Design a protein with these regions (language model features):
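Short acidic/polar, Gly/Pro-enriched loop/turn segments located at secondary-structure boundaries
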Residues: 1-132
Length: 132
């Protein structure tokens, strides 16, 4: 794999260069850890307000993301994924521009949805590649 060149945009607009700032991403109030190769989120207690994050990978890059429910996402070059820092009790939804491979953690009570423009892919737990 090549270099990641990925950037994370936090809800307050801060941009984190994930390749440069690896190993130190236990930011105050955030529930993720970055090791320079992947970004891993952890479940939070119910009732905490959902914050939307955006992972952006430019041309020539790639990055792996583990969402709070354990779903693994490989985000390809020239792609962007908007996702919550944790999921609600009844649904799991992300928004994709570009291409990604998903290994979705099975949860029959909370469908997993990928929104791609005016299209939506909804699954309960499976692996698939999608490009928009």
């Amino acid at each position: 794999p090549g270099s990641s060149k990925a950037q994370l945009v936090l809800p307050d607009g801060r941009r984190v260069d994930l390749e440069v700032d690896r190993g130190c991403q236990q930011l105050k109030g955030e529930n993720f850890v970055n090791d320079g190769k992947q970004l891993v989120y952890h479940e939070q207690e119910n009732g905490k307000r959902i914050q939307w994050h955006t992972l952006s990978v430019p041309r020539g890059g790639e990055y792996k993301l583990v969402l709070a429910d354990g779903t693994r996402v490989w985000l390809n070059a020239a792609s962007e994924l908007m996702y919550p820092d944790h999921f609600s009790a009844d649904q799991r939804k992300v928004v994709l521009k570009g291409e990604a491979y998903f290994e979705v953690t099975k949860d029959v009570k909370r469908p997993f949805s990928v929104v791609l423009g005016d299209m939506e892919v909804k699954v309960l737990g499976t692996s698939f590649n999608v490009s928009a």
